[in-house]
């Protein structure tokens, strides 16, 4: 299918392109697209439906505690500040945050200062007996854990196992090389991850990286964050919009390397 070849030239990994071609054939149901535009529309539908299937598979019911984990320096705390600000100011939801220590101390003082500014409680210790009303958005900030530190990763898993139902978002820097991102996901794959939150999206050179990460890890990219301003650029990832951005931005470049 010519449209699949175009996506591969725009950065989709060859293995993903082959998978997409097969999926499109099954999705087609005997109706052959008449031109490249219709082929692109078909691929958009195939990828978006698959994305939503993955998201539904890992979705946590109810109102779980949202936990942000990831390597040091990926922008977890900034992303959390954006998220909690939007929930509080835009969505008018009650919010409470826990800034917890891990295998090392959590030095993100900025989170506590931002919480004070927003009049959002930021606690330093978790207490099962001190929980807010059920409609409260609960967030947990933890220190970054190096992917090459198995002891720290295991300690992280043990600490999270003692908490109530969680929605664990893995925070990664979208400007990093695709190979590094996939290695980082593998390092945290022992956790029941609910999705990936990509930061520094404004520095990412290619939107193909978002699709390659999703297809390689079988995890939805839940949120996208760009810049340092708060609340700034922080939004839920919509697959249809990301496909359009992938194609529109990719057609303006000429480099065929995957990323």
What are the functions of these language-model segments?
Residues 102-105, 144-147, 174-178, 201-205, ...:
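Conserved nucleotide-binding/hydrolysis micro-motifs of P-loop NTPases
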Residues 147-156, 179-183, 206-209:
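Conserved ATPase-coupling elements of RecA-like P-loop NTPase cores
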Residues 19, 94-96, 165-172, 189-231:
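Conserved beta-strand/loop subsegment of P-loop NTPase cores
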Residues 135-147:
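Conserved P-loop NTPase "ATPase switch" module shared by AAA+ and STAND
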Residues 83, 112-116, 185-189, 211-216, ...:
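Short, solvent-exposed amphipathic alpha-helical segments in soluble enzyme
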Residues 93, 136-137, 150-176:
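Inter-motif core of Ras-like GTPase G domains
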Residues 3, 7, 214-259:
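NTP-binding/hydrolysis catalytic cores, primarily Walker-type P-loop NTPases
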Residues 1-95, 99-108, 113-133, 137:
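Primarily NTPase-proximal linker/entry elements flanking Walker-type ATP/GTP-binding cores
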């Amino acid at each position: 299918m010519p449209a699949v070849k175009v996506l591969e030239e725009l950065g989709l990994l060859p293995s993903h392109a082959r998978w997409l071609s097969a999926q499109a054939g099954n999705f087609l149901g005997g109706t052959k697209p008449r031109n490249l535009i219709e082929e692109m529309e078909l691929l958009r539908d195939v990828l978006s439906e698959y994305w939503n299937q993955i998201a539904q598979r890992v979705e946590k019911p109810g109102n779980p505690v949202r936990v942000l984990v990831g390597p040091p320096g990926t922008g977890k705390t900034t992303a959390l500040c954006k998220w909690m600000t939007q929930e509080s100011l835009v969505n008018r939801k009650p919010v409470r945050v826990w800034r917890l220590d891990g295998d090392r101390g959590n030095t993100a003082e900025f989170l506590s200062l931002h919480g004070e500014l927003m009049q959002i409680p930021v606690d330093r210790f978790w207490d099962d007996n001190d929980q807010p009303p059920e409609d409260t958005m609960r967030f947990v900030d933890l220190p970054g854990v190096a992917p090459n530190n198995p002891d720290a990763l295991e300690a992280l898993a043990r600490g999270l196992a003692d908490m109530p139902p969680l929605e664990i978002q893995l925070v990664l820097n979208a400007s990093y090389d695709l190979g590094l991102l996939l290695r980082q996901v593998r390092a945290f794959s022992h956790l029941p991850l609910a999705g990936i939150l990509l930061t520094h999206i404004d520095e990412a050179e290619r939107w193909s990286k978002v699709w390659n990460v999703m297809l390689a890890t079988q995890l939805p990219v839940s949120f996208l964050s760009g810049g340092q301003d708060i609340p700034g650029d922080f939004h839920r990832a919509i697959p249809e919009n990301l496909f359009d951005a992938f194609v529109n931005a990719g057609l303006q470049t000429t480099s065929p390397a995957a990323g």
